[in-house]
UniProtKB/Swiss-Prot annotation:
Name this protein carries in UniProt: Cytochrome c-type biogenesis protein CcmF
First-listed, main subcellular location of the protein, grouped into a coarse class: membrane
Keyword set, alphabetical order: Cell inner membrane, Cell membrane, Cytochrome c-type biogenesis, Membrane, Transmembrane, Transmembrane helix
Function of the molecule: Required for the biogenesis of c-type cytochromes. Possible subunit of a heme lyase.
Gene: ccmF
């Protein structure tokens, strides 16, 4: 009975989403405040109905209701209860329901926290978000219903959750990523509302920017957590592989970063209006593209869900409708919000525009490298591979001017400035950057690699100028805001991430060795000694754990416990890496296959500064969070009268 209730709640949600999509817009056209205000009620009802359906599915997993096909395919009585809850979004149908839940949650949040926003704007924004919800609810109900039954015959035991997903990181990674994806729908809705109304001013930017910041924070955390999970769970010691689905989350992050900065210019200087709208449309469009790549079956990835052609065609049609319709609307009405401001070449807004262009260019490089092999294969032209060298080379050389401008930008005033005002500071920063980028590799690794120097030069340039500018502000007694300190934290976070990338990419050491009890291998300054392998048993798996002692200069450093697990129901063998993490290095061991005569294949790594990559990502997210606390986002703006015909 419960699955039928869940299905009924989804049908109810579809009806409410349809009302939300139409009724408030009708109210805008008629100038009827009550009809416009109904959008908030519909948003609440939509969230409650979808949340109810989601809880029904969670309950089906907790009680092991294997009459539900989705539960039988992704759970097992031996699965710990917390993984049973996480299995709710562990495969295609449930993850789509999570998407719709979060979509309705964002819609409800806009309804709650929009009391200071003119009612006509709220009505348009919530209606557009309702339209997006309609598309995904139709997709779930007609192609991907998580409440489908296996009656009258159903298994007494489930197939189990994919062992790769039986990890704490994967409990939080998809919700965070989806919160970011879905969050950009708010910026998208504000952009479409601006095009419909024909106006975009600083107040619109002030409404949109906190929602964009929140989405960007969640997406940043999702990417950071996913990268860390890949590092410790997959057993290959990497943190980014330029996988198509990794790229699918990275592209909206790049455009979202550009959008945040563009909104700042629109808010401060009433510039970049059309550009800001285009970025908002592009960010959410790229989120839809990522959904298509994961669920269409056009690629093979550890992230991709198996899917049938009907699902792929539905998503493709929906994506074309949303993106195509948005771009057509932009082409037709974008001129109504075009800026009339001429910016000086040496001004903060011009430098921000240059970096916006570089971010979009980086996104296009990733988009080309991701889609070209897929398009080439679909056209019957054979298989081609675009791998890490292409992405690393193209991306690096786009980021060099980006880092240069990023360091200088906060030092330059809005409107017009003179370069000579900061000339001495730039000279000092240049000398400091040169010295640090040459000295640090030699101090930590006793050798200098050109690409490391380049990466450290970018990081030091950003960090030195950010710290120097903050010190100058403090010494002069200049008033600073949460937004300012958020910017400093985010820029320093990027510098920290670049340091981690520069060291880990160029100084990591990897060894694939055959080891048995008593064997030792030297890597960098460390000696790894293989002691033994013991049998272990978990709630739904059994395996072996290898004990590997590590010494440095003859003194004990740490002990690593690398596991090889066999999951009973799934019949899968998984590697659980052993990692000893530190501020400046990671020691990493992954147990491979058992060989003859008691020997094992073992993969050992020395990874310098790798944790700085994720620490920098967390600092960037913290910077975004600080910006959210800026008081100006809580100021009330007087409503503007809406023309009835401007829907």
């Amino acid at each position: 009975m419960m699955p039928e209730i869940g299905n009924g709640l989804l049908c109810l949600a579809l009806g409410i989403a349809l009302l939300l999509s139409v009724y408030p817009l009708w109210g805008v056209a008629r100038g009827d405040a009550r009809m416009m205000a109904s959008s908030r009620l519909f948003a609440w009802l939509l969230f409650m109905s979808v949340a109810g359906a989601f809880l029904v599915l969670v309950n089906a997993f907790v009680v092991n209701d294997f009459t539900v096909t989705y539960v039988a395919s992704n759970s097992n009585t031996q699965l710990p209860v917390w993984y049973r809850v996480a299995a709710t979004w562990g495969a295609h149908e449930g993850s789509l329901l999570l998407w719709v839940l979060l979509m309705s949650g964002w819609t409800f949040a806009v309804a709650i926290f929009s009391q200071r926003i003119p009612l006509d704007i709220v009505a348009r924004v919530l209606a557009i978000m309702g339209m997006v919800s309609v598309g995904f609810l139709l997709f779930i109900l007609f192609t991907s219903n998580p409440f489908s039954r296996t009656l009258p015959n159903f298994p007494i035991e489930g197939r189990d959750l994919n062992p790769l997903l039986q990890d704490p990181g994967l409990i939080f990674h998809p919700p965070l990523l989806y919160m970011g994806y879905v969050g950009f729908s708010v910026a998208f809705a504000f952009a479409i509302a601006s095009l419909l109304s024909g106006r975009l001013d600083s107040t619109y930017a002030r409404f949109t920017r906190p929602w964009t910041l929140a989405a960007w924070i969640f997406l940043t955390l999702g990417i950071v957590l996913g990268s860390a999970w890949a590092y410790y769970e997959l057993g290959w010691g990497g943190w980014w592989f330029w996988d198509p689905v990794e790229n699918a989350s990275f592209m909206p992050w790049l455009v979202g970063t550009a959008l945040m900065h563009s909104l700042a210019v629109t808010e401060q200087r009433a510039s970049f209006k059309a550009w800001t709208l285009l970025l908002a449309i592009s960010a959410f469009s790229l989120c839809l593209l990522g959904t298509f790549l994961v669920r269409s079956g056009v690629l093979v990835s550890v992230h991709a869900f198996a899917s049938d052609p009907a699902r792929g065609m539905f998503i493709l049609a929906f994506m074309v409708l949303v993106i195509g319709g948005s771009l057509l609307l932009f082409a037709a009405r974008g001129h109504k919000v075009r800026s009339r401001v001429n910016n000086a070449l040496w001004s903060r807004e011009s430098l921000l525009l240059a970096n916006n262009v570089l971010l979009v260019a980086a996104m296009l490089v990733v988009l080309l490298g991701t889609l070209l092999p897929l398009v080439h294969k679909q056209l019957g032209l054979g298989s081609i591979s675009i791998g890490e060298p292409f992405f690393n080379t193209m991306f690096t050389w786009l980021m060099v001017p980006f880092a240069l401008l990023l360091g200088v930008g906060p030092l330059v005033r809005w409107g017009r400035d003179r370069p000579r005002k900061i000339r001495n500071l730039l000279i000092i920063a240049f000398i400091s950057t040169l010295v640090l980028s040459l000295l640090l590799p030699w101090l930590f690794e006793s050798k200098v690699v050109a690409m490391t120097v380049l990466g450290l030069a970018m990081a030091c340039w950003i960090a030195v100028l950010a710290i120097a500018e903050a010190a100058l502000r403090i010494s002069r007694g200049t008033k600073t805001t949460f937004s300012y300190w958020g910017m400093v934290a985010a820029h320093l976070g990027l510098a920290v991430t670049i340091v981690g990338i520069a060291f880990s990419q160029n100084y990591s050491v990897e060894r694939d060795v055959r080891m048995k009890s008593g064997d030792s291998v030297d890597i960098h300054e460390y000696r790894f000694t293989f002691r033994d392998v013991k049998e272990v048993t978990g709630p739904n798996w059994r395996g072996g754990v290898a004990t590997i002692g590590v010494t440095r200069d003859g003194k004990p450093e740490t002990v690593l416990y690398a596991e090889k697990r066999y999951y009973n129901t799934a019949g899968s063998m998984m590697t659980e890496a052993a990692i000893d993490g530190g501020i400046t290095r990671d020691l990493y061991a992954a147990l491979g296959e058992e060989l003859e005569n008691g020997a094992w294949a073992v993969r050992l790594y020395y990874k310098p500064f790798v944790r700085w990559i994720w620490a920098g990502g967390l600092m960037m997210a913290l910077g975004g969070l600080l910006c959210l606390f800026d008081p100006r986002y809580r100021k009330r703006v007087s409503p503007q009268k809406t023309a009835p015909e401007a829907v």
